[in-house]
């Protein structure tokens, strides 16, 4: 088990940082939307864009992953997520924010798929459950830390 963790520690560290950023983004966007005067329905639509992106990303990203590989998909999805966060600062509009939340959800779906498939490749039948439980602890712990 220790060997499997040592070969994937960078993946876990990256996941921890990404999850913390995601948790922070949820809190800050909701607060900033209220401060900007978005009504509750607009704020709800903005925040639900993330889950629409997760849904579409979970369907589309595996096809992209099969054609270009783990590293390229992870890099592209990280870049999309980073750009989406920055666009929130530039535009103070619910429709633009909804599109960026969709992009964030899409890219996070991609990063989660890459992480999970990488872990499944590295795991043996004996270590798979332990690695995936560490993955979930890291993911949810990072989100909690970000909030």
Q: Where on the chain are the PLM-derived regions?
A:
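Residue-level signature of mid-helix packing/kink "hotspots" within the transmembrane helices
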Residues: 51-59, 143-144
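Intracellular juxtamembrane helix-capping segments at the cytosolic ends
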Residues: 29, 110-123
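Structural signature of the two symmetry-related core transmembrane helices
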Residues: 72-86
